[in-house]
Amino acid sequence: MRIAILSQGPQLYSTKRLVEAAQARGHDVHIINPLKCYMNINMRQPSIHIAGKELPQFDAVIPRIGASITFYGSAVLRQFEMMGVYTINDSVGISRSRDKLRSMQLLSRKGIGLPITGFANKPSDIPDLIDMVGGAPLVVKLLEGTQGIGVVLAETRKAAESVLEAFMGLKANIMVQEYIKEANGADIRCFVLGDKVIAAMKRQAKAGEFRSNLHRGGTATLVKLSPEERTTAIRAAKTMGLSLAGVDLLRSNHGPVVMEVNSSPGLEGIEAATQKDVANAIIEFIEKNANKAKS
């Protein structure tokens, strides 16, 4: 098969592992920077070009689109879809998952466990917003943030009011969530592929930090999931319309709650913590499903 990996980072661990796994299984792999692509949107023969040359036909695409280029990256992916190319995650699923508020609304509608979440526009609504999520401590999140950036723990009501007023003054889109104290600074990353969780790790925040992201110094260890956690992760990925997803859960007193569904989960942390060949599993999944899509 000829496989395209949409990525700006050929040197990144996840991209390199996917290339290695695909080549080891005899596939022709190309890393394509979506920002270098331009498109001919044509009802008869849609095409994608780079530097004056039309790209050849691909059998499958693996999107590794960074959050900062979601709009253009999704447009390029849509063009591949128009050309009949199999994509492990489609443009609609990626767009859904990148919109944190929309994600929460979709998951809530499906009855999937979530932290109590509030959203407002006017500073005059701040007192009600704080009460809505159970008061302080609470978590304030920038809707556009990634890797723990733009996530603030407000430990007192006064701090929460100050942070919310500051963000609203900057016209930033934010949401407020209850603080799940019993999680003790740990979350669980479930790696969902199709209708299975193929790997899972517990991420523990470093001392003095509440964000467990590995980019912020958190540590990862193998974890055993409960049946409810496994089911929640699979349902969350399916709700977003994603075949491949990193679903982040917290263990709360009322069961697992979903914090985020990531459409482009990194492989380095999960492969190191679980010693599983996740990259190979992804390529195997593509082989099976790309061929199914053709038949």
Curated annotation (Swiss-Prot):
Query: Which EC class does it fall in?
Result: ligase
Q: Which residues form the ATP-grasp domain?
A: 104-287
- Textual note on the cofactor: Binds 2 magnesium or manganese ions per subunit.
- Give the binding site residues for ATP: K141, E178, Y179, D187, R211, S212, N213
Please give the superkingdom of this protein's source: Bacteria
The record's listing under Pfam families reads: RimK, Rimk_N
State which Enzyme Commission number(s) the record gives.
6.3.2.-
List positions binding Mg(2+) 1.
Answer: D248, E260
Can you tell me which residues bind Mg(2+) 2? E260, N262
PROSITE patterns found in the cross-reference section: ATP_GRASP
What does the record list as GO biological process? protein modification process; SOS response; translation
Q: Which cofactor does it need?
A: Mg(2+); Mn(2+)
Listed GO cellular component terms? cytoplasm
Is the Lipid biosynthesis keyword given for this protein? no
Any one Gene Ontology MF annotation carried by this entry is: metal ion binding
What keywords does the record list, in alphabetical order? ATP-binding, Ligase, Magnesium, Manganese, Metal-binding, Nucleotide-binding, Protein biosynthesis
Where, in this chain's numbering, is Mn(2+) 2 bound? E260, N262
- Which amino acid positions bind Mn(2+) 1, per UniProt? D248, E260
Query: What is the name attached to this protein's record?
Result: Probable alpha-L-glutamate ligase 1
Q: Which gene encodes it?
A: rimK1
